[in-house]
Amino acid sequence: MLRRAARAKALQALFAIDVGGTSPDMALEQVLEEGELPPRAMTFTRELVEGTMAKRDAIDAIIRKYAVGWRLERLAAVDRNILRMALYEMQYHRETPVRVVINEAIELAKNFNNEEAGRFVNGLLDNARKDLGLSEEIENGYSGD
């Protein structure tokens, strides 16, 4: 559950960066200053935000490929950032099984948007997973979610 809370905080920071033009450092400071997360979860939040921002161009290219009929800019900002974060975690931060990352992204979409957003996120991430050749599991130790 700590990683779920960390992902929600990371999403809030990514949303502030994307929509509000907030700097990544300021966005992280704002979401982490509430002190609701233990240090390990704060570290995970920071890794997700910094990693997603570092790989954003490559991740956005993946989203564009699979968001058939949608321009990236036309996607709901919350969905766009859920997809960015999940694709970062699936492709570059391979500590969690892909199926868990996808399920967490679906839950975030349903909680921060609606059921339809959850289905959209699920479809896009699953298509990307298959096409990118990502196994649903991970080869090395799973740190737990």
Curated annotation (Swiss-Prot):
* Keywords tagged on the record: RNA-binding, Transcription, Transcription antitermination, Transcription regulation
Q: Which cysteines are joined by disulfide bonds?
A: none
Is this entry keyworded Transcription? yes
Q: Which GO terms describe its biological process?
A: DNA-templated transcription termination; transcription antitermination
Gene Ontology CC annotation, any one: cytosol
One of the entry's Gene Ontology molecular-function terms is: RNA binding
Q: Could you tell me what this protein is called? A: Transcription antitermination protein NusB
Say what the protein does.
Involved in transcription antitermination. Required for transcription of ribosomal RNA (rRNA) genes. Binds specifically to the boxA antiterminator sequence of the ribosomal RNA (rrn) operons.
Which family does the UniProt entry place this protein in?
Answer: Belongs to the NusB family.
Q: Which organism is it from?
A: Moorella thermoacetica (strain ATCC 39073 / JCM 9320)
> Gene name, please?
nusB
One matching Pfam family is NusB
